[in-house]
Amino acid sequence: MTNETLETIKNRRSCRAYKPEQITNEELDAVLEAGTYAASAMGRQSAKIVVVQDATARAQLTRMNAAVMGRDTDPMYGAPTILVVLADAHAPNAVPDGSLVMGNLMLAAASLGLGSCWINRAKEEFETEEGKALLRQWGIEGDWVGIGHCILGYPAADPKPAAPRKPDYIVKV
């Protein structure tokens, strides 16, 4: 059985090379809207998406993420858009809720021909004083946990084919 959604799921790949051009507002809004329709525990919608396209803010996030990683590289791969996904730290299912948002963002991006990749270490970034100050600067008050960064842009290269699925991936009982 196949359909467009299943094909998008099977063909989505993490993109780690981006063209410098910014994505359009129409593309961005479509990806963001898909993120807001992610399933959430009891419909609480505990996640929040922060759009970062400003060069200074992108550089700050890149530096903070690299510091957590212990490297002096660009963990955002030069992507022109970073979507920071946060979740209410007091929500019982904050991490699953935010993770579903991340999945929707990446699948929506793939459906539009955009590249995306989940970049880790958001939790550690926003546990720091600098991270908490950044949230306040963005007007985000309260207790939030960083779920991930969904980087977006136009792919600079074609994606590699998927690796074969491991034979014991599924167990039917």
Annotate the PLM regions:
Residues M1-V173:
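Acidic, surface-exposed loops and disordered segments
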